[in-house]
Protein backbone atom coordinates (compact mmCIF):
# COMPACT_ATOMS: atom_id res chain seq x y z
CA UNK A 1 0.00 0.00 0.00
CA UNK A 2 2.82 2.42 0.85
CA UNK A 3 6.10 3.08 -0.94
CA UNK A 4 8.62 0.30 -1.35
CA UNK A 5 10.98 1.50 1.40
CA UNK A 6 8.19 1.38 3.98
CA UNK A 7 7.17 -2.09 2.83
CA UNK A 8 10.79 -3.17 3.10
CA UNK A 9 10.94 -1.85 6.65
CA UNK A 10 7.82 -3.84 7.47
CA UNK A 11 9.23 -7.08 6.07
CA UNK A 12 12.43 -6.71 8.07
CA UNK A 13 10.25 -6.46 11.19
CA UNK A 14 8.39 -9.66 10.31
CA UNK A 15 10.17 -11.67 13.00
CA UNK A 16 6.84 -12.94 14.28
CA UNK A 17 6.09 -14.73 11.04
CA UNK A 18 9.48 -16.42 11.11
CA UNK A 19 8.60 -17.61 14.59
CA UNK A 20 5.18 -18.79 13.47
CA UNK A 21 6.94 -20.80 10.80
CA UNK A 22 9.39 -22.11 13.36
CA UNK A 23 6.46 -23.56 15.26
CA UNK A 24 5.94 -25.80 12.27
CA UNK A 25 9.56 -26.79 12.77
CA UNK A 26 8.58 -27.70 16.35
CA UNK A 27 10.61 -25.02 18.12
CA UNK A 28 7.52 -23.60 19.82
CA UNK A 29 8.78 -20.03 19.70
CA UNK A 30 6.71 -16.87 19.44
CA UNK A 31 6.91 -13.10 19.54
CA UNK A 32 5.01 -10.28 21.16
CA UNK A 33 6.43 -7.48 19.08
CA UNK A 34 4.51 -7.65 15.81
CA UNK A 35 1.03 -6.29 15.19
CA UNK A 36 -0.69 -7.79 12.19
CA UNK A 37 -3.59 -5.39 11.94
CA UNK A 38 -5.87 -3.06 13.82
CA UNK A 39 -8.82 -4.66 15.59
CA UNK A 40 -12.14 -2.88 15.27
CA UNK A 41 -14.53 -2.52 18.16
CA UNK A 42 -17.72 -3.17 16.20
CA UNK A 43 -19.49 -5.98 17.90
CA UNK A 44 -19.23 -9.69 18.60
CA UNK A 45 -19.47 -12.07 15.70
CA UNK A 46 -21.60 -15.22 15.87
CA UNK A 47 -19.99 -18.63 16.02
CA UNK A 48 -19.25 -20.08 12.63
CA UNK A 49 -21.11 -23.29 11.75
CA UNK A 50 -19.31 -26.57 12.18
CA UNK A 51 -20.33 -27.42 8.63
CA UNK A 52 -22.54 -25.83 6.04
CA UNK A 53 -24.76 -26.90 3.19
CA UNK A 54 -21.76 -27.22 0.92
CA UNK A 55 -19.71 -29.06 3.54
CA UNK A 56 -17.45 -26.08 4.20
CA UNK A 57 -15.93 -27.53 7.36
CA UNK A 58 -14.65 -30.58 5.54
CA UNK A 59 -12.41 -28.34 3.45
CA UNK A 60 -11.44 -25.77 6.07
CA UNK A 61 -10.18 -25.52 9.62
CA UNK A 62 -13.01 -24.70 12.03
CA UNK A 63 -12.32 -22.30 14.90
CA UNK A 64 -15.05 -21.34 17.36
CA UNK A 65 -15.80 -17.75 18.27
CA UNK A 66 -13.32 -16.61 20.93
CA UNK A 67 -11.25 -19.80 20.71
CA UNK A 68 -7.55 -19.26 21.38
CA UNK A 69 -5.10 -21.98 20.39
CA UNK A 70 -1.45 -21.88 21.50
CA UNK A 71 -1.84 -18.10 21.42
CA UNK A 72 0.09 -17.01 24.52
CA UNK A 73 3.09 -15.91 22.48
CA UNK A 74 0.91 -13.81 20.18
CA UNK A 75 -0.88 -11.54 22.62
CA UNK A 76 1.08 -8.66 21.13
CA UNK A 77 -0.51 -9.37 17.75
CA UNK A 78 -4.04 -8.25 16.96
CA UNK A 79 -4.52 -11.48 15.01
CA UNK A 80 -2.43 -14.56 14.26
CA UNK A 81 -3.31 -17.83 12.61
CA UNK A 82 -1.47 -20.96 11.49
CA UNK A 83 -3.39 -23.86 9.95
CA UNK A 84 -2.13 -27.25 8.83
CA UNK A 85 -4.01 -27.53 5.55
CA UNK A 86 -3.15 -31.21 5.20
CA UNK A 87 -5.03 -32.20 8.36
CA UNK A 88 -7.16 -29.04 8.79
CA UNK A 89 -5.74 -28.75 12.32
CA UNK A 90 -5.30 -25.26 13.74
CA UNK A 91 -1.84 -24.81 15.23
CA UNK A 92 -2.18 -21.14 16.26
CA UNK A 93 -5.35 -19.07 16.60
CA UNK A 94 -5.47 -15.63 18.15
CA UNK A 95 -8.45 -13.31 17.63
CA UNK A 96 -9.19 -14.93 14.28
CA UNK A 97 -12.83 -13.73 14.23
CA UNK A 98 -12.08 -10.19 15.39
CA UNK A 99 -12.60 -7.59 12.70
CA UNK A 100 -9.47 -6.02 11.22
CA UNK A 101 -8.56 -3.73 8.33
CA UNK A 102 -7.10 -5.86 5.51
CA UNK A 103 -5.04 -3.18 3.72
CA UNK A 104 -3.57 -4.60 0.49
CA UNK A 105 -4.61 -8.14 1.37
CA UNK A 106 -7.85 -6.85 -0.17
CA UNK A 107 -6.18 -7.40 -3.54
CA UNK A 108 -6.47 -11.16 -3.09
CA UNK A 109 -10.21 -10.85 -3.71
CA UNK A 110 -9.62 -8.44 -6.58
CA UNK A 111 -7.27 -11.00 -8.10
CA UNK A 112 -9.86 -13.76 -7.71
CA UNK A 113 -12.46 -11.83 -9.71
CA UNK A 114 -9.94 -10.86 -12.40
CA UNK A 115 -8.84 -14.48 -12.85
CA UNK A 116 -12.45 -15.66 -12.92
CA UNK A 117 -13.18 -13.12 -15.66
CA UNK A 118 -10.20 -14.42 -17.63
CA UNK A 119 -11.28 -18.03 -17.20
CA UNK A 120 -14.83 -17.23 -18.30
CA UNK A 121 -13.50 -15.53 -21.41
CA UNK A 122 -14.85 -12.09 -20.51
CA UNK A 123 -11.34 -10.66 -20.74
CA UNK A 124 -7.93 -11.99 -21.78
CA UNK A 125 -4.45 -11.52 -20.37
CA UNK A 126 -3.50 -10.16 -23.79
CA UNK A 127 -6.29 -7.57 -23.98
CA UNK A 128 -4.89 -4.05 -24.27
CA UNK A 129 -6.37 -1.33 -22.07
CA UNK A 130 -5.91 2.38 -22.87
CA UNK A 131 -6.31 4.77 -19.96
CA UNK A 132 -8.52 7.84 -20.25
CA UNK A 133 -7.05 9.41 -17.09
CA UNK A 134 -4.51 8.98 -14.32
CA UNK A 135 -5.97 7.16 -11.34
CA UNK A 136 -5.28 9.19 -8.20
CA UNK A 137 -5.78 8.62 -4.48
CA UNK A 138 -6.25 10.84 -1.45
CA UNK A 139 -3.38 9.08 0.36
CA UNK A 140 -0.24 10.85 -0.82
CA UNK A 141 1.97 7.78 -0.44
CA UNK A 142 -0.40 5.19 -1.88
CA UNK A 143 1.55 2.72 -4.02
CA UNK A 144 0.83 3.42 -7.70
CA UNK A 145 2.40 3.06 -11.12
CA UNK A 146 3.41 5.90 -13.44
CA UNK A 147 0.42 5.29 -15.72
CA UNK A 148 -1.39 8.41 -16.97
CA UNK A 149 -4.11 9.12 -19.48
CA UNK A 150 -3.15 7.88 -22.95
CA UNK A 151 -0.99 5.02 -21.67
CA UNK A 152 -1.86 1.51 -22.77
CA UNK A 153 -0.94 -1.92 -21.43
CA UNK A 154 -2.20 -5.48 -21.26
CA UNK A 155 -4.47 -7.01 -18.66
CA UNK A 156 -1.52 -9.24 -17.76
CA UNK A 157 0.62 -6.26 -16.79
CA UNK A 158 -2.24 -4.74 -14.81
CA UNK A 159 -2.82 -7.98 -12.89
CA UNK A 160 0.86 -8.63 -12.27
CA UNK A 161 1.43 -5.03 -11.17
CA UNK A 162 -1.53 -5.33 -8.79
CA UNK A 163 -0.48 -8.58 -7.16
CA UNK A 164 3.33 -8.38 -7.20
CA UNK A 165 4.18 -4.82 -6.22
CA UNK A 166 0.68 -3.78 -5.07
CA UNK A 167 -0.04 -0.99 -7.57
CA UNK A 168 -3.36 0.41 -6.36
CA UNK A 169 -4.18 2.11 -9.66
CA UNK A 170 -3.97 -1.22 -11.47
CA UNK A 171 -6.78 -2.49 -9.26
CA UNK A 172 -9.05 0.42 -10.13
CA UNK A 173 -8.35 0.04 -13.86
CA UNK A 174 -9.15 -3.67 -13.74
CA UNK A 175 -12.28 -3.09 -11.66
CA UNK A 176 -13.62 -0.58 -14.16
CA UNK A 177 -12.73 -2.86 -17.07
CA UNK A 178 -14.65 -5.80 -15.59
CA UNK A 179 -17.61 -4.14 -13.87
CA UNK A 180 -17.83 -0.66 -15.38
CA UNK A 181 -17.10 1.05 -12.07
CA UNK A 182 -15.17 0.35 -8.89
CA UNK A 183 -18.41 0.46 -6.90
CA UNK A 184 -20.00 -2.24 -9.06
CA UNK A 185 -16.83 -4.30 -8.77
CA UNK A 186 -16.99 -4.03 -4.96
CA UNK A 187 -20.51 -5.45 -5.11
CA UNK A 188 -19.00 -8.43 -6.92
CA UNK A 189 -16.28 -8.70 -4.28
CA UNK A 190 -18.81 -8.74 -1.45
CA UNK A 191 -20.97 -11.28 -3.24
CA UNK A 192 -17.96 -13.54 -3.77
CA UNK A 193 -17.00 -13.20 -0.11
CA UNK A 194 -20.45 -14.41 0.94
CA UNK A 195 -20.30 -17.24 -1.58
CA UNK A 196 -17.13 -18.68 -0.04
CA UNK A 197 -18.27 -18.18 3.56
CA UNK A 198 -16.33 -14.99 4.34
CA UNK A 199 -19.45 -13.45 5.82
CA UNK A 200 -17.70 -11.06 8.21
CA UNK A 201 -16.01 -9.17 5.40
CA UNK A 202 -17.09 -5.94 3.70
CA UNK A 203 -15.25 -4.28 0.82
CA UNK A 204 -15.73 -0.69 -0.34
CA UNK A 205 -12.71 -0.52 -2.66
CA UNK A 206 -10.62 -2.90 -4.74
CA UNK A 207 -7.19 -2.06 -3.30
CA UNK A 208 -7.43 -1.77 0.49
CA UNK A 209 -6.64 1.89 1.10
CA UNK A 210 -8.26 2.78 4.38
CA UNK A 211 -11.98 3.18 4.87
CA UNK A 212 -13.70 2.57 8.20
CA UNK A 213 -16.33 0.47 6.42
CA UNK A 214 -13.74 -1.75 4.72
CA UNK A 215 -12.94 -4.71 6.98
CA UNK A 216 -12.49 -8.45 7.30
CA UNK A 217 -11.26 -11.07 9.80
CA UNK A 218 -8.23 -13.34 9.88
CA UNK A 219 -10.49 -16.34 9.36
CA UNK A 220 -12.20 -14.75 6.37
CA UNK A 221 -8.80 -13.98 4.84
CA UNK A 222 -7.93 -17.64 5.32
CA UNK A 223 -11.00 -18.57 3.26
CA UNK A 224 -10.25 -15.90 0.66
CA UNK A 225 -6.64 -16.94 0.03
CA UNK A 226 -7.77 -20.55 -0.31
CA UNK A 227 -10.18 -19.45 -3.03
CA UNK A 228 -7.41 -17.45 -4.69
CA UNK A 229 -5.16 -20.50 -4.70
CA UNK A 230 -7.64 -22.53 -6.74
CA UNK A 231 -6.40 -20.64 -9.79
CA UNK A 232 -3.17 -21.84 -11.42
CA UNK A 233 -2.30 -18.30 -12.47
CA UNK A 234 -2.11 -17.30 -8.80
CA UNK A 235 0.93 -19.53 -8.30
CA UNK A 236 2.57 -18.26 -11.48
CA UNK A 237 2.30 -14.66 -10.28
CA UNK A 238 3.19 -15.32 -6.65
CA UNK A 239 6.34 -17.28 -7.53
CA UNK A 240 8.05 -14.36 -9.28
CA UNK A 241 10.89 -12.44 -7.64
CA UNK A 242 10.94 -9.83 -10.43
CA UNK A 243 8.69 -8.84 -13.31
CA UNK A 244 9.08 -6.41 -16.21
CA UNK A 245 6.00 -4.21 -15.93
CA UNK A 246 5.56 -3.02 -19.51
CA UNK A 247 3.34 -0.34 -21.00
CA UNK A 248 3.18 2.13 -23.88
CA UNK A 249 3.23 5.76 -22.80
CA UNK A 250 1.03 8.52 -24.20
CA UNK A 251 3.67 9.32 -26.85
CA UNK A 252 3.76 5.73 -28.11
CA UNK A 253 7.04 4.77 -26.48
CA UNK A 254 7.45 1.43 -24.72
CA UNK A 255 8.31 1.72 -21.04
CA UNK A 256 9.60 -1.13 -18.91
CA UNK A 257 9.78 -0.98 -15.12
CA UNK A 258 11.29 -3.96 -13.29
CA UNK A 259 9.15 -4.53 -10.22
CA UNK A 260 9.76 -6.74 -7.19
CA UNK A 261 7.30 -8.40 -4.82
CA UNK A 262 6.43 -6.72 -1.54
CA UNK A 263 7.16 -10.10 0.08
CA UNK A 264 10.85 -9.96 0.96
CA UNK A 265 10.95 -13.67 1.64
CA UNK A 266 10.78 -13.93 -2.16
CA UNK A 267 13.38 -11.26 -2.84
CA UNK A 268 15.76 -12.89 -0.35
CA UNK A 269 16.02 -9.82 1.86
CA UNK A 270 14.51 -11.80 4.74
CA UNK A 271 15.66 -15.37 5.37
CA UNK A 272 13.11 -18.13 4.92
CA UNK A 273 13.31 -21.48 6.73
CA UNK A 274 15.07 -24.18 4.72
CA UNK A 275 12.91 -27.02 3.48
CA UNK A 276 9.80 -24.90 2.96
CA UNK A 277 8.46 -23.19 -0.13
CA UNK A 278 6.01 -20.31 -0.56
CA UNK A 279 2.70 -20.60 -2.38
CA UNK A 280 0.16 -17.80 -2.59
CA UNK A 281 0.74 -14.70 -0.45
CA UNK A 282 -0.15 -11.04 0.04
CA UNK A 283 1.19 -8.28 2.25
CA UNK A 284 -0.66 -5.24 3.51
CA UNK A 285 0.39 -1.95 5.08
CA UNK A 286 -1.56 1.19 5.99
CA UNK A 287 -1.44 3.56 8.94
CA UNK A 288 -4.69 2.10 10.27
CA UNK A 289 -4.16 -1.56 9.41
CA UNK A 290 -0.51 -1.51 10.44
CA UNK A 291 1.37 -4.45 8.88
CA UNK A 292 -0.06 -7.74 7.68
CA UNK A 293 0.98 -10.83 5.78
CA UNK A 294 -0.89 -13.97 4.75
CA UNK A 295 1.01 -16.77 3.08
CA UNK A 296 0.75 -20.40 2.02
CA UNK A 297 3.67 -22.66 2.91
CA UNK A 298 4.67 -26.18 1.93
CA UNK A 299 7.02 -28.64 3.60
CA UNK A 300 9.11 -29.75 0.64
CA UNK A 301 9.94 -33.11 2.24
CA UNK A 302 6.54 -34.21 3.51
CA UNK A 303 4.24 -32.25 1.20
CA UNK A 304 2.37 -30.84 4.21
CA UNK A 305 0.78 -27.47 3.49
CA UNK A 306 0.12 -24.57 5.85
CA UNK A 307 -1.50 -21.15 5.81
CA UNK A 308 -0.02 -18.49 8.12
CA UNK A 309 -1.34 -15.01 8.87
CA UNK A 310 0.05 -12.29 11.11
Regions from the language model: what does each represent?
Residues 13-14, 108, 297-299:
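Hydrophobic alpha-helical segments, especially transmembrane helices
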Residues 29-30, 198-199, 210-215, 219-310:
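Domain-terminus/edge residues, biased toward the C-terminal soluble/receptor-binding domains
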Residues 34-219, 228-229:
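Active-site-adjacent loops and short helices of periplasmic peptidoglycan-processing enzymes
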Residues 21-23, 201, 277:
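Exposed boundary/loop context
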